[in-house]
Amino acid sequence: MRKTVLFVLATLGAATPALAGQSATTDRTGYIAIAAGDLTTAEQRIVAERKIFPQRPELMLNLATVYHRTGRESEARALYAAVLDRPAVAMDLPSGAVVSSHDLASRALARQSQQIATR
């Protein structure tokens, strides 16, 4: 089963302006808000959606992105680990690529580890 995902994983550079035409009311994954740099709005939307769909990997990955960008590294790592604890889901990226939720979470964790090691 593939999920269509409208998200930005900042640590992987997956941001594209291709979805900028969507209205804010359909930005349930926080993609548009993250892409616009409005991390407060993104976090509010994602947290609200996670109350309904707590296990959706695209929401966990996007919230982890918000946490990472706002300096909450331990919270971001916990969400990436939570994605890895669930079955892998094929995700359509805004670029058109299809990537496993596990691959995205693993790459983000590896990148965080590299950043910590170089500090």
Where are these regions (language model features)?
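Classic N-terminal secretory signal peptides
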Residues: 1-22
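TPR/TPR-like (Sel1-like) alpha-helical repeat modules
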Residues: 73-90
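TPR/TPR-like alpha-solenoid helical repeat scaffolds
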Residues: 91-116
